[in-house]
C-alpha cells in the first residue's frame, strides 16, 4: 500500500470504521506515519500499523482520533515518540499503547501524561538509554509499564510520577547499575506493585540519600512494592537498611543468581509480610541465627546452590508459616537438632550436600507430622537405623534417598510411614534388600512409585504392592523378571528395565495388563519376534528400544501395537534392509518417534525412506553417530504439523532441503539444542507467512548449545522472529515477564529430573499462594 490519494482513501467509512489493521501492509518506502489518510477516521478505536517500516510519527498524528483506545506500532523503526503525541484532553479513552521492537532512544518529559484511561504502555526491546523526569506522569489507571530489553542505565527521580494503580513495572534486561527506591515514591500506592529488575548490572546496593518530600505532587510514605525481582545481576553486597523503604510491603523477594556472601537480620529480618525469599545460586557461606527474626510470615525459602556449611539452630524460631525450605546444593554435613520447631512444614530439600546420617532430630514432632516431601538424595547417608523416629512422619508421601551410601534396609524400616506413596532408593550401589519383600513392609497399599535403579539387584525382590503404578529397575544385573512378580504389581503402568542383562523381552510383560510404558534400553536383546511384545501389544503406549543390537527383527513385531504413541529405537546395522517406515506401517496412532544413532553413520536415507505413520508429528534424531541429515530422510512425513528435534549429534549443518521435502507440513518447529558441532541451520520456513498454500512456516525454534556463527546463514532468524511476533504472538495474549519468571521458578523446582514429575499437593497449594500475589488465578481438577 502506497497511500496514493490519501485524503480520499477512507472517506466513505470515516464515520463508521472502528478498527483498522494494516500490519505488514505498507510499502517499505512509506516511512512517515500516514496521518493525512487516517485523520478522517474520527470514530476509530483500534489502530494497528505494526510490522511495517515506519520511522517518523509526527506529534499531531493522533490528534483527530479522539475515540482511539488502542494503538499498535510495534515492529517498526520508530526513533522518537514526540511530546504531545498523546494528549489527555484529546485521548480520554486511550487504554493501550504498543511501541515494542522499535528504535526509540529516549522518552521525553510528559511523553505520557494526563491520560486518565491508559492502562498499558509497551516500550520493550527498543534502544532507550534515558528516561527524562516526568516522562510518565499522572497516569491514574496505568497498570503495566514494560521497559524491558533496552539500554537504560539510570532512572531519574520523578521519572514515574503519580502512577497509583501501577501493578507491573518491567525493567529487566537493561543496564541499570544502581537502585534507588525513591524513584518509586509515587508509584503503585493503590495496587499490587511488581518490579522486575532482573538481568541488569547491579553490583553494590547502597542506601540512596533521601529526597525531599513534596506535598503537592508526591504521594509520600514508604513504598508499596509487593514483588521485587533482582535476580540475574552481579550483586555482591547489600547495605544495611537498604530494604528499609520496602520492608513493610514486600511479599516476594527474588535475589537468585547473584554473588551475595551472607544473609543477616539487617537485610531480611524485618519484613513482616514477606512470604517468598529466593537466595539461590549465590555465594552464601552463612546465615545469621537471627536473619528472619521479625519475618514471621515466610513460607518459601530457597538457599540452594550456595556454599553454606552450617545452619544456626535458631534460624527458624517462631516461623510458624514456613512451608517449603530448599537447602540443596550446599556443603552441609548435618542439620542442628530442633531446627524446625513449628508445625506446618511441608517440603524439605537437603539434596546434594554432605550429610552422613538422616537429619531426623532436626524436625520436632510438630514439624515432622506435617512434612509431606523430603529430598535427601546425593548425600553420604549410610544407614536408615532410626530408633523408630521415622514413625513421626505421619503425612510423608514423597521420599528421595537416591545417590547415597545405603548398605541395608531392615524389615519394617518404613512401616511407620502410613502415607508414603513415592520412594526413591536408586543408585545406592551397595544396597541390600530383603528378597522376601520385608524391606517394604507397611507400604503394601500406599506405595505408588518405587525407584530401585543401580542397587545391585540380580533378581526382583518380592513386592506385595498391588497399587504400584511405576517401577524403575534400571542399571542392575537382572537376567530376567520372574513371571510370578506380576501378581503383586497388577496395577503397574510404567516399567523401566534399562541397562540390565535381559536377553529377551521379559514374559512378565504379557501379564501386566495395565502396563502403558516399557523401557528396555541398553539390554543385550538380539531378537524381536512377532510374539515378543504380543502380551503388551493391546495396551502399550510407549516403548524404548534404544542402544540394543538387534540381529533379528521380524516384520510383524510392532504390527499389533495399535495404542502405541511413542517409540524410541536405534539403527540396527545387523538387520538386512532395515527400514523404519516399513516396520511401522501398521502403527497408525504413532505420534512420537526417536531414532538414536550410536555408531558412525553418514545418513539415514535408506533407513527412513518410505511413508511415515499419518499421525507422526514429533521426530527426534539423537546420538553422536549421526553426522549428516538430508532432505531424502523426510520425504515420507505426512502430518501437517511437525516437530523436529536434533539432540546431541555430530551434525554440522542442517540444509534447507530437509524442510523443503516435507511437502504436507504446514507448521514446523525445530529444536537443535546441545549439538556441539552444529554451525549452520538454514531457514525451515518454506513460506513467507503461516497458512500460505503448499508451504510451511516455522512456529518455534530452540538453538541453545551450538557453535553458531552470526553470519548471513543465520541472519534469517531475525526476520523470522519479526514475523513470528506478527503472526503467532498476538499482543493481547502476551504475559508479563515477571509472572513468567515466578511460574518458571516453580517449574524449575518441580522438574526434579525424575522419570515422572509428580506435582504433589504441596506444590498445588503453594502455587496458589505465589500466583495470588501476581494476580493469576489457578484452578485444577482432582
From Swiss-Prot:
Q: Keyword Aminoacyl-tRNA synthetase on this protein?
A: no
| LRR repeats: from-to residues | 16-37, 43-64, 67-88, 93-114, 117-138, 141-162, 165-186, 191-212, 224-245, 249-270, 273-294, 297-318, 321-342, 344-364, 370-391, 395-416, 419-442, 446-467, 468-488, 491-512, 514-535, 539-560
Question: Which residue windows are coiled coil?
Answer: none
Q: Which domain of life is it from?
A: Eukaryota
GO biological processes: cell adhesion; visual perception
Q: Does the keyword Repeat apply?
A: yes
Q: How does it sit in the membrane?
A: Peripheral membrane protein
Spell out the subcellular localization from the entry.
Cell membrane
Q: Name one GO cellular component term.
A: plasma membrane
InterPro entries from the entry? Leu-rich_rpt, Leu-rich_rpt_typical-subtyp, LRR_dom_sf, SLRP
Glycosylated residue positions: 196, 234, 262, 454, 488, 530, 618, 648, 667
- Keyword vocabulary terms for this entry: Cell adhesion, Cell membrane, Glycoprotein, Leucine-rich repeat, Membrane, Repeat, Sensory transduction, Vision
SUPFAM superfamilies named in the record: L domain-like, RNI-like
Say what the protein does: Required for photoreceptor cell morphogenesis. Mediates homophilic cellular adhesion.
Q: Which family does it belong to?
A: Belongs to the chaoptin family.
Q: What is this protein called?
A: Chaoptin
Organism listed in the record? Tribolium castaneum (Red flour beetle)
